[in-house]
């Protein structure tokens, strides 16, 4: 079973993603801050198939988490954010995100 790390400080969104992905057959771990995500990634750096990453997080930002992930390898990262400007999208994708989904989103947008 593939494991997905959900990094989202909004409890409702985090739980919604976890529920939908679990029903689709994925194993999920949740982080509610950039600091927590970084800790989990350091403990389990090769066990995740994908990271769903919010940009606006308490503590360490999503951008910093993405930078840390890219230093270690090619773990796929899909950014989920309320930041919807073209400049922000280009910046994040250039920094190494594999996809960029703007909130609010439909759950089907993150199903793969």
Label the model's feature ranges.
Residues 1-112:
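N-terminal/domain-start alpha-helical segments
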């Amino acid at each position: 079973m593939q494991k997905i790390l959900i990094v989202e400080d909004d409890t409702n969104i985090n739980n919604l993603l976890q529920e939908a992905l679990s029903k689709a057959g994925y194993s999920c771990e949740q982080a509610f801050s950039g600091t927590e995500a970084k800790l989990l990634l350091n403990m389990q750096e090769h066990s995740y198939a994908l990271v769903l990453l919010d940009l606006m997080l308490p503590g360490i930002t999503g951008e910093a988490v993405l930078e840390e992930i890219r230093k270690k390898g090619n773990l796929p990262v899909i950014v989920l954010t309320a930041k919807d400007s073209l400049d922000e999208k280009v910046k994040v994708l250039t920094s190494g995100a594999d996809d960029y989904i703007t909130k609010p989103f439909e759950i089907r947008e993150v199903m793969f």
